[in-house]
Amino acid sequence: MTEDKKVSVSMFIKELELEVVHKGENTDYEIISSDINRPALQFAGFFEHFAYDRVQVIGKGEHDYFGTLDRATRLRRLEKLFSYEIPVLVLARGLDFSSDTINMAKKYNRIIIRSQMSTTKFINKASGYLSEKLAPSKTVHGVLVDIYGIGVLLMGKSGVGKSETALELVKRGHRLVADDAVEIRRIEDDMLVGEAPDILKYLMEIRGVGILDIKNLYGVGAIRTNKVVEMVAELEYWEEGKYYDRLGIDEEYMTLLDVPVEKIVIPVKPGRNLAMIIEVAAKNYRQKNMGYNAAKIFNEKLLKKLSD
């Protein structure tokens, strides 16, 4: 299930350690976009297509330009600016707000804050923070493991052996990211990042044994806090008569948060070393990304042999 994310201005101020210049009592707004707006055009009097729902940042350029306007014009522009429900107005570089700006913020019950950082650094930091917090997300049932630098999401029905396979992978030197519940965020158009909920971080459940703390049992080298999800390995009980891919020519994909992720289906039956199979699958995935596809090369050789 996907979630619509919002960040309160109070949390934004706290996390980025910003100075509050004015914030009315019982006043808070929610930030819904990671994009930042610099209201230079608005200070010049152009309010068409004004992205008022974004964090508004004033740098030295806007600050100095605004100071060249006569007071009557400044008041009109401020009145117009604050008449929109902007979430917050930020002044970078430690610059000062004029008394007119503060009074107008009080009139419209808006929040104004200050950062000591340069404008560019503040925008980069604020945008990165908001992108992470506002990224589309969902929680899936599975186990996420870092195998040779490839984020592999193990999925399948409950009891099929996902956690046991992940434990064997950890013993083989790979790193656990999340067990049972994986929180996945789309931080870019085609990039998914998975992590464990705080309450489950570094923990694993093994039936018959109970809860294991992987960090304490195997050390910090056996865990990581998050990982890009690059491949899905779905474990399913072996079904006699069902076709399973034996060549690996046809690639299958699973869509997560509108992002296609390469998927392989691994049939589970006694005697199969699932950890080793998934380990090899991760190596093969990396090899294909480097331009070498063993299945396609074999197929080309076979077709050439048949045509001779």
From Swiss-Prot:
It holds the Pfam family Hpr_kinase_C. Its cofactor is Mg(2+). GO terms for molecular function: ATP binding; magnesium ion binding; phosphorelay sensor kinase activity; protein serine/threonine kinase activity; protein serine/threonine/tyrosine kinase activity. SUPFAM superfamilies: HprK N-terminal domain-like (SSF75138), PEP carboxykinase-like (SSF53795). It is an enzyme of class 2 (transferase). Keywords: ATP-binding, Carbohydrate metabolism, Kinase, Magnesium, Metal-binding, Multifunctional enzyme, Nucleotide-binding, Serine/threonine-protein kinase, Transferase. Residues 267-272 are annotated as: Important for the catalytic mechanism of dephosphorylation. ATP binds at residues 156-163. Coiled coil: none annotated. Residues 204-213 are annotated as: Important for the catalytic mechanism of both phosphorylation and dephosphorylation. The active site is at 141, 162, 180 (proton acceptor), 246. PANTHER family: HPR KINASE_PHOSPHORYLASE (PTHR30305:SF1), PROTEIN YJDM-RELATED (PTHR30305). The Walker A ATP-binding motif also binds Pi and PPi. Both phosphorylation and phosphorolysis are carried out by the same active site and suggest a common mechanism for both reactions. HAMAP family: HPr_kinase (MF_01249). Homohexamer. This is HPr kinase/phosphorylase. The gene is hprK.
